[in-house]
UniProtKB/Swiss-Prot annotation:
GO CC, any one term: nucleus
Stated role: The heterotrimeric Elba complex is required for chromatin domain boundary function during early embryogenesis. It binds to a 8-bp sequence 5'-CCAATAAG-3' in the Fab-7 insulator or boundary element in the bithorax complex and contributes to its insulator or boundary activity. Elba3 lacks DNA-binding activity and plays the role of an adapter protein, bringing Elba1 and 2 together, thereby establishing a complex that recognizes the asymmetric sequence motif through the BEN domains of Elba1 and 2.
Name of the protein: Early boundary activity protein 3
Subunit architecture: The heterotrimeric Elba complex consists of Elba1, Elba2 and Elba3.
Domain of life: Eukaryota
Keywords: Nucleus
Gene name of this polypeptide: Elba3
Source species of the chain: Drosophila melanogaster (Fruit fly)
Length: 379
């Protein structure tokens, strides 16, 4: 495993659990993203090794229901692989892309083969839960080049593992640039399939609803899958059912947070979107490095980044007012926490001023004593 969290900044899945209690996950505590630091050994097997690992967390993953401690102590707890871990907050933002940018920047120096060639590949695999479309970055040293298929416009084939054949979508001699290309493809794909439906009365979700979701089970990988709502977990506790879904892959105890791109009662509609995404990656023109430098918006998604956040969209679709009340409550908690923090800062300033005044007074008294003593000696 790398020293970067499974949620590498290239996804919106927030790998590992959401806010959890003895009775299951709780509601979101705050609509914010955090860049945090944890011990790599603790994340792997519960034994600290002193190596730093960076991870992206959402408030919904944190165990504390009171957000005020986050502003004061900078330490939070979250659950992963059945363990409760403590993380040190590095920064927080209401926009995920800001945390992603910080993660990419801080992790650049820690990666190996930063200048080596990277391949962006695409393949499908069949799981018990259904077919998955996977796009990921791989090193050419870890694959075997096979052939080229003319009907796929010359996209070469590579073997990633026995029985796993992938198409090369793009290749370049810069890992940093290729990470941005994966983000670009992800954003464009999201825009293509996203249902931007803000109707007053959206279609209700039930166990028979089919969803096209996007998630990342590991760094530098994006997965698309059509799943039925009944296949997700933590359904009762999920306040944002039409925005996010909690998924547990077969044979794994890890819960992934997936983004719901579109949903409906007709599976064929979602399958058609899935197949469109599968074809779309072969037709897209990827921007060159200099184009990304001149036009950073190439990396962003109109649907995912430029519009209001997905969680705000959930609030807009909130017909009962539940989300709005939650957000109002959280904003009040945030204001209270910030007010308490300012009170503590003011208190420290007051104590500091008192200490300075005392020191100044003591210094003046000492000078007076010295002057009196010196005068007595002269007489």
């Amino acid at each position: 495993m790398s020293n970067i969290s499974n949620d590498s900044g290239l996804d919106d899945s927030a790998n590992s659990g959401a806010v959890v209690s003895a009775n299951g996950p709780l509601a979101a505590t705050r609509l914010s993203w955090f860049l945090a630091e944890v011990d790599d050994g603790l994340m792997k097997d519960g034994k600290p090794n002193g190596r730093r690992r960076l991870c992206v967390l959402h408030s919904m993953e944190l165990l504390e229901s009171d957000v005020s401690d986050k502003y004061m102590t900078r330490f939070v707890e979250f659950r992963v692989n059945g363990m409760v871990l403590e993380a040190k907050l590095i920064l927080a933002a209401d926009e995920r892309r800001l945390v992603d940018a910080a993660l990419l920047s801080m992790s650049k120096e820690e990666r190996e083969d930063a200048g080596g060639q990277q391949l962006l590949v695409q393949y499908t695999e069949n799981e018990k839960a259904g077919e998955r479309l996977i796009q990921k970055l791989v090193s050419p040293n870890n694959v075997m080049l096979l052939s080229t298929k003319p009907e796929l416009k010359g996209n070469p084939l590579v073997r990633l593992a026995p029985g796993c054949i992938a198409h090369i979508l793009y290749a370049y001699e810069s890992r940093d640039y290729m990470e941005k290309i994966l983000l670009h493809l992800k954003a464009r794909s999201f825009d293509l399939a996203f249902d931007d439906n803000l109707e007053a009365e959206p279609e209700a979700m039930n166990d028979d609803t089919w969803m096209l979701v996007q998630y990342s089970p590991e760094p530098e990988m994006v997965v698309y899958q059509v799943v039925q709502y009944r296949q997700t977990v933590w359904r009762k506790e999920n306040l944002f059912k039409d925005v996010i879904a909690y998924m547990q892959l077969p044979g794994s105890d890890i819960v992934l947070q997936a983004v719901v791109i579109s949903y409906g009662q007709d599976k064929e509609v979602q399958d058609a979107k899935y197949e469109e995404l599968q074809r779309f990656s072969f037709d897209i023109d990827f921007p060159l490095p200099e184009e990304l430098e001149k036009h950073p918006d190439h990396m962003t998604s109109t649907a995912l980044f430029s519009r209001t956040s997905l969680y705000q969209k959930a609030e807009q679709r909130d017909t009962t007012g539940e989300h709005r009340e939650l957000r109002k409550s959280l904003e009040q908690m945030s204001e209270k926490a910030q007010g308490e923090a300012q009170m503590i800062i003011d208190a420290f300033d007051m104590v500091d001023n008192i200490n300075k005044n005392l020191q100044s007074r003591l210094s003046g008294e000492v000078r007076s004593v010295v002057e009196v003593t010196s005068g007595d000696e002269l007489h």
